[in-house]
Regions:
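Chalcogenol-based redox active-site neighborhoods
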Residues: 1-115
């Protein structure tokens, strides 16, 4: 399990970043945010009933993270299309200000010791 300050494993994942279908997805890697701290959090699956509460709470803290030179990244093993559909379905997730990573191969989750 990684601790604060440990080197993040290399990764390249598709992320859902916008509700506009023309700007909805982008690729994010371990070097996408040079000079920034990365805060990663994961949830078990999209469309679960408790997870939106925690996701919204992280979103509400995102301004504080940015003030601290940190970038917030959330994710699960669902694909980017499921992330977007969940955001459309659940109004509380419509305006998230951080990328939702899609780790469908479970590589980053495994490297981080989450799975």
């Amino acid at each position: 399990m990684l601790k604060v300050g440990d080197k993040l494993p290399e990764f390249k994942l598709t992320a859902t970043v916008d509700m506009d279908i023309n700007k909805a997805f982008t690729e994010i890697t371990h070097v996408s945010y040079p000079g920034k701290w990365l805060i990663l959090f994961f949830w078990p699956k999209d469309f679960t009933f408790v997870c939106p509460t925690e996701i919204v709470a992280f979103n509400e803290l995102n301004g504080k993270f940015k003030e601290s030179n940190a970038v917030l990244l959330g994710g699960s093993t669902d694909n980017e299309f499921v992330h977007r559909a969940w955001r459309q379905y659940n109004k509380d997730l419509n305006d998230l200000s951080f990328p939702m990573l899609s780790d469908i191969k479970r590589e980053l989750c495994s490297d981080l010791g989450i799975l």
